[in-house]
Amino acid sequence: PVDSDTELNRVIPVIAGLRDAGVTISISIDTSKARVAEAALSAGANIVNDVTAGRADADMFSVVAAASCPYIMMHMLGEPRTMQDSPSYSNVVMEIRAYLSERISAARDAGISDIIIDPGIGFGKSVEHNLRLLAHVEEFAALGVPVLLGISRKRFLGAITGVEAPADRDAVTMMMHALLADKPVDIIRVHNVRMAHYVFALKSALHSAS
C-alpha cells in the first residue's frame, strides 16, 4: 500500500488532465482513502471504487454520501499482501453475501444510495472459491443492488487454462464472460474493451434471433 500523498500525486493530474482535454466518460477512482476519494471527485472523477467497502477509512462513507456518487464496495479477505495465503471459508458464497449485505446496510445508514457490489474475485479466494462465486452470482444480485465482476486476466483463469502471462489471458477472459452472459451481472471490468464488446454484441444478436 502507498500513502495518501503518493496516491494523490499519481491520480489527480491524470483525472484533471483528462477533464481538461474534454474527456466526458465516467472516471472511477480506486482508493480506500477518503482524502484521495474527495480530491479525485473534485478533480472530475464520478465513481468511488473501494476494495475495503469502507472499512479502511472511517471518513469514506461521509465523503461518498456528500458527493452523491456511485460507490463500489468489494469483498476482500484480509490484506492485499496476505490475502492469498491459504484463504478459507465455511461457505464462501453465503459468507461473502452476508458481508456485502452488512456493508450495504452500513452505507445506506450513512446516506449512500447509489451502491454497487463486487464479490472480489481473486481477492482472498482460491480457484475453487472464485468458481463457486461465479456459479452462484445470483445470490449477490438478490441483495438488490447492481453487481460488478472483475475477472479480466485474473490468476485463476491462468490456473485453469495454463495461460501463464496475464496479457495473454484476454481470450480466456472473454470465454468466461460468454459463459456468464446470462447471469445477473450488471457491470464487468475488463482490460480489452474491444473484445468484450464483441462478446456482448454476439450475445445480443443471438438473443434477438431467439
Where are these regions (language model features)?
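Active-site metal-binding loops of divalent metal-dependent hydrolases
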Residues: 121
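Active-site-adjacent loop and "lid" segments of alpha/beta metabolic enzymes
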Residues: 1-26, 31-35, 41-42, 46-109, ...
